């Protein structure tokens, strides 16, 4: 692929917005969860989580082990890789409108739950790479050719070997490509073939990853327990409902202020936009009922892939970092607004910018809270150390 001037401008704008959004992390990134252990011992350890490609990448960039703490370099590299991946699909989804493309694609990072992913000193690189590769994989497969299905399957294995939750991003971008074709009035037969190709690439890659990698590498009671699927019996429906309610409680806990009504407004904007898109698509179209049904299915699927297959797990991980799909959903909402109201670009851009502003304020507050928590924990550890020394424990 050759980068034109619009691609270069898009990458510049996107990286500028990303730097503003992640500025506290780029200037001072605290140790988060697994970071401290890796900084102390220089170990890898991602393979046991079913993420061997993460081990491989850090082994290569560190020229072996022990791995070093090069923060914020992993985060910077991750954002750049994501920007490059998005530039590959910018023209298909947005044409020459690189400004709106930058604002919409920023929703992937501006996802309030993605703050946890970006906060890791090490994993921020591989998690961003996983999202980037999943987007490219979805795009490659959405072109009906046998070779593209093979390439997509390989890329699917790659992004699952980096971070499994990016599967939802693959699915939501597939929906984005479908709605793009609906707006461009592509034939139902072409849309169906491309969709089938994309689904095939995902399924083949997923089963190959599950059998050849996850089945052989995932170790530890924690990893094994959280990867179990709900048994197909009388408690199946009850388990799914329980998972949905648990994720809903997490949503409502994090997005519980008046300022965060802006995120809920995206859902209503999506519905209105899809109605407008349907009315435009079925005007003088012979496949009115088919396209109406397709758009309804797209709406339901976009909401499902906020959580995705995790609702079928016996003990899913209830943590913000697994909700990468929320960023994809936010992007999809903005994309539909863009398609529905192309003649009102200024209003759309103002709306998208306001969402980014709220998200940036939220992220700065979250980063400060993480930093304050780390300082508190550091203070407690220092006091314990001083007490131990004062009492004489450990002396010969």
Task: Report each predicted region and the residues it spans.
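Membrane-lumen/periplasm interface segments of specific transmembrane helices
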Residues: 194-272, 310
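Perimembrane helix-loop-helix junctions
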Residues: 170-200
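Membrane-interface transmembrane helices that cradle and orient dolichyl/undecaprenyl
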Residues: 134-149, 183-185
């Amino acid at each position: 692929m050759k980068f034109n001037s619009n691609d270069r401008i898009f990458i510049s704008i996107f990286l500028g917005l990303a730097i503003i959004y992640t500025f506290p992390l780029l200037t001072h990134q605290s140790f988060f969860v697994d970071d401290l252990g890796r900084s102390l011992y220089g170990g890898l350890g991602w393979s046991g989580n079913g993420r061997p490609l993460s081990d491989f990448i850090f082994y290569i960039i560190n020229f072996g082990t022990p791995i070093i703490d090069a923060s914020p370099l992993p985060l910077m590299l991750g954002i750049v890789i994501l920007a490059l991946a998005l530039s590959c699909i910018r023209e298909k989804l947005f044409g020459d409108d690189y400004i709106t493309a930058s604002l919409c694609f920023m929703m992937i990072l501006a996802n309030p739950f993605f703050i946890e992913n970006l906060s890791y000193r090490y994993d921020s690189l591989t998690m961003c790479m996983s999202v980037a590769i999943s987007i490219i994989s979805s795009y490659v497969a959405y072109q009906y050719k046998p070779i593209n299905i093979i390439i997509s399957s390989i890329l699917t294995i790659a992004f699952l070997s980096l971070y499994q939750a990016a599967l939802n991003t693959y699915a939501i971008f597939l929906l984005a490509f479908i709605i793009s074709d609906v707006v461009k009035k592509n034939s139902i037969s072409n849309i169906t073939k491309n969709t089938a190709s994309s689904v095939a690439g995902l399924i083949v890659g997923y089963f190959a990853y599950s059998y050849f990698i996850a089945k052989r590498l995932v170790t530890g009671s924690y990893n094994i327990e959280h990867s179990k699927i709900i048994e197909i019996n009388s408690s199946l429906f009850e388990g799914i409902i329980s998972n949905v309610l648990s994720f809903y409680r997490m949503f409502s806990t994090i997005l519980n202020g008046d300022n965060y009504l802006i995120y809920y407004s995206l859902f209503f904007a999506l519905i209105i936009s899809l109605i407008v898109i349907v009315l435009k698509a079925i005007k003088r179209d012979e496949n009115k009922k088919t396209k109406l049904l397709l758009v309804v299915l797209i709406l339901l699927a976009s909401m499902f892939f906020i959580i995705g297959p995790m609702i079928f797990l016996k003990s899913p991980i209830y943590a913000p970092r697994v909700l990468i799909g929320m960023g994809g959903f936010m992007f999809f909402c903005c994309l539909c607004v863009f398609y529905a109201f192309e003649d009102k670009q200024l209003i759309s851009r103002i709306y998208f910018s306001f969402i980014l502003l709220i998200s940036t304020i939220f992220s700065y507050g979250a980063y400060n809270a993480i930093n304050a928590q780390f300082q508190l924990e550091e203070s407690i550890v220092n006091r314990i150390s001083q007490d131990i020394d004062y009492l004489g424990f450990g002396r010969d």
